[in-house]
Amino acid sequence: MKTLIAVSVLSILSFGAHAERQSNEPIKVIEPISGLDSKKIELGKTLWFEPRLSASNTISCNSCHNIAKGGVDNLPSSIGHKWSIGPINSPTVFNSDLNFVQFWNGRAKDLQEQAAGPIENPLEMAFTHQLAVDTLQSIPQYREWFQQAYGSDNITIDNVTDAIATFEQTLRTPNSPFDLWLKGNDDALTTAQVEGYQLFKDKGCTACHSGPLAGGQMYQKMGLVKPFATDNPDVG
C-alpha cells in the first residue's frame, strides 16, 4: 500500500512539473485539432485537390501549398494561371489555423476568408466564385457530398470555402521533439538543443518568437515597401 501511495505521489509530482514547464515556457505546444465535422473535413480535402476550381482546370490549392512539400511549393514565388509568376512566396498551410491573420499582409481574418481569394486572383486560379460553384453544382457527386456535409445540395461559395478551411484546420504538426520536451519528455531534445533554446530565450528572441508557432503573431517591417532604415546598431 505504501508503495502504491508513493508511486501515486510521484506521478502527481511528475505531472505537475510537466504542466509547469508548459505554462512557463514562451513557446507553446501545438495540439491536434478536435471536434470538427468529419464530412466537412473529407469534402474540404477533396476540394483542396480539385483543379476544376481554376480556369485552366490544372491548378488546385495544393499546387501552391503542397502538403507533401511542407505545405508550400518550394519556389521563391508561386506559378499560377498561364504560368504567371506571383509577387510573393507561398506561406505554409501547416498550422495555418493558428495564425492570428491570413496572408503575409493579414488581409484575411481567417482561413475561410483566405480560401476565397486565390480562386478569383487572376495570377493564381483566375476563375470566379460563380463559375467555381457552377462547376461543382454540375457534378452529381459533389451535390451529394454537400448534401451530406451541409444539409443541402445547393452549393454556395461560403460552403466551399468553409469546407476547405475545415480541412486546413486538421493540418497541424503535433508531437514534434520540441513539443514532446515541452510536455515533459527530457529525452526528446539533446543537451545542446536545450542549451540552444535557453540561449534563444536569454537573447530575447522570444519577445517576437513565442506561442505555438514560435512567431507569426504580429506585423513586422520587412523592407518590402521601402528600404528599412534604423539607427539601432543591433541589426540582429
Predicted features along the sequence, with ranges:
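Positively charged n-region of N-terminal signal peptides that target proteins for export
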Residues: 1-4
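Bacterial N-terminal signal peptides
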Residues: 6-12
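N-terminal signal peptide c-region/cleavage motif recognized by signal peptidases
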Residues: 14-16
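Short glycine/threonine-rich turn/loop motifs
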Residues: 20-117, 179-236
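Short alpha-helix boundary/capping motifs
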Residues: 72, 121, 139, 174-175, ...
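Periplasmic c-type cytochrome electron-transfer domains
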Residues: 81-169
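Amphipathic alpha-helical substructures
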Residues: 144-200
